[in-house]
Amino acid sequence: MNVSVVTERRTPAYSSLAAGELNGLVARALLTEARLTPKPGLVDIRNSGAHRDMDLAAFERSTTAIAPWMEKFFIMGNNTAALAAENVLVMLRPLGMACENDMLQATNGVNTHRGAIFAFGLLSAAIGRLIARGEPLEQNRICDQVARLSRNIVAHELSAKKAGKLTKSETHFQCYGLSGARGEAESGFRTVRTQALPVFNRVVQEHDDTHLALLQTLLHLMAWNDDTNLVSRGGLEGLYYVQQQAQKLLWQGGVLVEGGIEAMQSLDDELILRNLSPGGSADLLAVTWFLSHFPAGSLYPE
């Protein structure tokens, strides 16, 4: 089956970035991920994946609603750059809640991008801080700022014993040790920097094909990311199933070998039957594409 895809080439690396430009770059990251096809269990051009309450049009409306908020995260990060990073998170939360409200209005109450709002809100604030400090916009510096903004977020929000029923995120952490999006942010997007970006860059360099690079990167994320979206839908069994199937495809060459795209489509069909959607990995894929537009920089920025 042939499917139409968006195969936008990466723009030259950004040495600086205006707040308004940031809105556009985040929107392109979200739309590039949403339109990438085929994505097992996820909304794409081919189908709605394992989701019965959303489709590609909903993701496009959601992107239009939330992208303008990135400028506000940027400005907050820029205006508070003199403060210790860990003291800024509380100031970002109201922006995140308002952004999420606009998303829900655009999608008639469907959560299309909550994880992406969290990730890109932090990234936008981090970029604002770096520009205010006169520091270069580099992948490792941006992610280091995200880690500083998110310091102790797992301990504060997931570890503490509370009265009443645990949230899904608290259950995932306290029962299984899975820290989800908060843990990834607190690590400075370690999974993206150590796994996803190297794969993406290698495939782009060797094949000059952003579409293939994104699909191969998604497979790597599905294979190794402890995606709590999968745990919510299928328990640990669902997570392990997706990881094992993605690893199997990678051992066979992934989408870089003959029949690889068809194998992704078959896995898509299987995950739909099992009601499994690796939404956390999809968010990290969008983050990967976004960060690829900046130079890597030194591994341990000052």
UniProtKB/Swiss-Prot annotation:
Q: Which is a GO BP term held by this UniProt record?
A: prosthetic group biosynthetic process
Provide the GO MF annotations for this entry. Answer: ATP binding; triphosphoribosyl-dephospho-CoA synthase activity
Catalytic activity reported: 3'-dephospho-CoA + ATP = 2'-(5''-triphospho-alpha-D-ribosyl)-3'-dephospho-CoA + adenine
**Database matches in InterPro entries:** CitG, TriPribosyl-deP-CoA_syn_CitG
Q: Does the keyword Nucleotide-binding apply?
A: yes
Keywords in alphabetical order = ATP-binding, Nucleotide-binding, Transferase
Task: Give EC number(s), comma-separated.
Answer: 2.4.2.52
Would the keyword Transferase turn up in this protein's UniProt record?
yes
A Pfam family that this protein carries is CitG
HAMAP family, per the entry: CitG
Recorded family membership:
Belongs to the CitG/MdcB family.
By its UniProt entry, which PANTHER family does this protein fall under?
A: 2-(5''-TRIPHOSPHORIBOSYL)-3'-DEPHOSPHOCOENZYME-A SYNTHASE, TRIPHOSPHORIBOSYL-DEPHOSPHO-COA SYNTHASE
Protein name per Swiss-Prot or TrEMBL: Probable 2-(5''-triphosphoribosyl)-3'-dephosphocoenzyme-A synthase
Q: Which organism is it from?
A: Salmonella gallinarum (strain 287/91 / NCTC 13346)
User: What gene makes this protein?
Assistant: citG
